[in-house]
A protein has these predicted regions:
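Short, conserved catalytic-motif segment at the N-terminal edge
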Residues: 1-42, 61-66
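The feature captures the short pre-catalytic strand/loop hairpin that immediately precedes
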Residues: 28, 113-122, 232-241
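Flexible glycine/proline-enriched surface loops and loop-helix/loop-strand junctions
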Residues: 34-36, 119-126, 136-139, 238-247
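Active-site helix/loop module of the DD-peptidase/beta-lactamase fold
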Residues: 35, 40-44, 56-100, 117-118, ...
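Active-site-proximal alpha-helical segments within enzyme catalytic domains
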Residues: 90, 136-143, 249-270
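Internal, well-ordered domain-core segments that constitute the primary functional module
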Residues: 99, 114, 120, 125-145
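Active-site Gly/Thr loop motif
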Residues: 186-255, 286-335
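Short acidic alpha-helical/loop segments enriched in Asp/Glu that coordinate divalent cations
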Residues: 270-284, 297-299
């Protein structure tokens, strides 16, 4: 197969019942996958960010019906009509960088933020759904920072991970990078999927001969949202990427910690007498706010709550969240 190594964990009724891991963490197969190996979970990070958002809603700090400019005045100069809920549900029309991807370090937070502040949306905010694959990081992340005062990753570390002993990080300390499993692109060099499925595979994973073919069969919105210029081939394994806080895509953690985190949410939002948030707030956050069709993801009818991907994402070809059942919530990701 194409996997060098992997891990899977399951919690049931508040108890860990499965924690499996195996294989290797690099292409040279010189390091075995261990219990504490960390993996970049990509867009699963959006659900973790969603937990942080839900927590500050729960605490009365954020009102999702207010305009973004109420909390972030600079954003309102070019986007005066955008509501907070538009950012949280991929309906802000800001799924790409109109002037091209900023040329900077992943740690240059303000550069990304100012680029988005200075542009107008592709569509009228609230009028359509278009998956904000990476721009979600700086749109939702900067909103969060303006409201709470901390970056999402710092808040998650202080208020969630440390409370429940979770080995999950948005912005990984450099002294922990040795535990990371590398993302391998060469494993896909000989991949020859059917034509219909090429468009569903992230461009950075495709061999060169299929990249141009893909660009001809996907929408302009997709190309804006998944602009390959944002990534160099080694970026996901770089110190810069792992240290940065990219709350749409670069969460690093263990399967066991993710299972525990969502296990807490699914069993009353409390563990060891420590309350994470109110169940009523979680229920509101995980109810459907938008159903698509999604202009970035091929017109798919993807259901979102407040950052969370929900059940009901089937298309004729692909279900973007195949393990999410009725009343379930989380997020799909390529990690």
């Amino acid at each position: 197969g194409y996997e060098l190594g992997c891990s899977v964990a399951i919690e049931y009724e508040g108890k860990e019942v499965v924690n499996l891991y195996g294989g290797y963490t690099n292409t040279s197969k010189s390091t075995e996958w261990k219990k504490n190996t960390l993996v970049n979970v990509w867009s699963v990070t959006k659900a973790v960010t969603g937990i942080c958002i839900t927590k500050i809603v729960n605490d009365g700090l954020l009102n999702v019906d207010k305009k973004v400019s109420y909390y972030w005045p600079e954003y309102g100069i070019n986007n005066p009509d955008t509501k907070v809920i538009d950012l949280l549900t991929h309906r802000a029309g800001m799924f790409g960088f109109k002037e091209g991807s900023p040329i900077c370090s992943w740690n240059d937070w303000d550069v990304f933020v100012k680029a988005l502040e200075s542009q107008k949306p592709y569509y009228q905010p609230g009028s359509s759904q278009g998956y904000h694959a990476l721009t979600f990081s700086w749109l939702v992340g900067e909103l969060f920072r303006r409201v709470e005062g901390r970056m999402v990753g710092d808040y998650f570390r202080d208020e969630v991970a440390s409370q429940y002993n979770l080995d999950f990080h948005i912005g990984l300390s450099e002294d922990q990078h040795y535990r990371c499993a590398d993302i391998s692109f060469k494993r896909f060099d000989n991949l020859k999927p059917p034509l219909e499925f090429i468009k569903y595979i992230p461009t950075i994973f495709l061999p060169n001969d299929l990249k141009n073919l893909k660009s001809s069969i996907v929408s302009q919105d997709f190309n804006h949202a998944f602009n390959g210029d944002l990534f160099n081939l080694n970026d996901p394994n770089s110190t810069d990427w792992r240290k940065a806080q990219v709350p749409a895509a670069n969460g690093h953690g263990t399967a066991a910690s993710l299972a525990k985190l969502f296990g807490i949410l699914s069993t009353g939002c409390e563990r060891d007498n420590i309350k994470l948030l109110d169940t009523t707030t979680l229920k509101t956050a995980t109810s459907i706010k938008t159903r698509g069709p999604d202009t970035v993801l091929f017109g798919s009818k993807i259901n979102f709550g407040l950052c969370f991907m929900l059940n009901g994402n089937e298309t004729n070809k692909v279900n973007f969240a195949p393990v999410i059942k009725k009343d379930g919530f989380g997020h799909a990701g390529i990690g």
